[in-house]
Amino acid sequence: MIDDHRSVHLVHGPGNDGMLLCLQVVKRALLSGSNVFWIGDLPAASAKSVLGSVNEEFLSRLLVGSNEAIESDSMILRTADLVIMWPWCTNHGRAGKSEISRLRGILDSTNGRVVAASLGNQDASGGGGMTARSRSMLEEMGLETWFLSRQDTGFRRVLKSPDREVELERRDGEFSVVST
């Protein structure tokens, strides 16, 4: 699905598709023995539905913290193989300078990769697509932008980067790749 080696900005629509995809990335990382740090909201029901089958030894590698409590030079960030920021910015308007600065600090402090998720904006030009908050700034910081959107059919989703498109199908609370 999402490249396992690059930091990404995941732009998603309303609903829980973005959360589900991030949790699947977390599950894959935990099962491979990685240390994961989730910054932001992590509802227990969503986490249980995806991570409920992961054994305690692997789950012990998952830490959850808040945006307000994280310090960019923390040991947790330095030892994390994967950092999920859910969400990295507010869900309306432009991302604030403090949010961009916090993301930059986290990118500079972690040796692992970062997935910064945010709700997309509707394209004001009437094109019908989604736009990403502060896209050019985040790409300058090294994040690749991926858009997760629904297809017309109920179970299908499209995960799209500048050079790849992956068709996903949502079944039994998880995404599986249909075509790349």
Locate the predicted segments by residue.
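Phosphate-binding/switch region of NTP-binding enzymes
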Residues: 112-180
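Conserved catalytic network of the ASCE P-loop NTPase/AAA+ motor domain
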Residues: 2-3, 28-31, 56-57, 75-78, ...
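Conserved inter-motif catalytic segment of the P-loop NTP-binding fold
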Residues: 34-98
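Well-ordered alpha-helical segments embedded in enzymatic catalytic cores
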Residues: 21-25, 72, 102
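The Walker A/P-loop phosphate-binding site
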Residues: 1-55
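Hydrophobic/aromatic beta-strand patches that form the interior of the parallel beta-sheet core
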Residues: 9-11, 37-39, 65, 115, ...
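Short, flexible loop segments at the rims of nucleotide/cofactor-binding pockets, characterized by
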Residues: 14-16, 64-65, 124
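P-loop NTPase motor core
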Residues: 77-141
